[in-house]
């Protein structure tokens, strides 16, 4: 958990990963969130945690919603994000027999939006999100249909 807490380098990266958290991310904040989530998953490279994600909602035989996605800054644009999202998709399909996967991405997270659309996720809704500083963002909801076999 300590290593995952160090992945977001600044307030904006933490906001993209975990909008309700305070920077810097602490073990207690992370523990309190993941206790209510499913299948927290890390990507390891040479025994170093380089990526993290989980499901914040699971509806068996329907959909899983992927959240808390982050990749170590040193490993961005090197396939780790793709590997991580594919791993979460596999868990959703095999463990929960889902036909859709959902995720959310803020409008300012260009890298995330480009990755998710490259992986086949399509926007279906945009929500107004107001952060702790009362700043407004657009939270883009995306989904991907999949063969659950």
Provide a role label for each language-model segment:
Residues 3-76, 85-87, 91, 145-147:
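Acetyl-CoA-dependent GNAT
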Residues 19, 26, 78, 122-125, ...:
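Serine/threonine-rich low-complexity intrinsically disordered regions
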Residues 83-100, 122:
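Conserved acyl-CoA
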Residues 99-102, 106-113, 118-149:
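C-terminal "cap" of GNAT-fold acetyltransferases
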Residues 68, 72-86, 106-114, 118:
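Conserved glycine-rich acetyl-CoA-binding loop
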Residues 35, 62-63, 97, 136-138:
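Residue-level preference for beta-strand/loop junctions
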Residues 68, 96, 103:
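Extended, folded domain segments that form the structural surfaces/walls around functional sites
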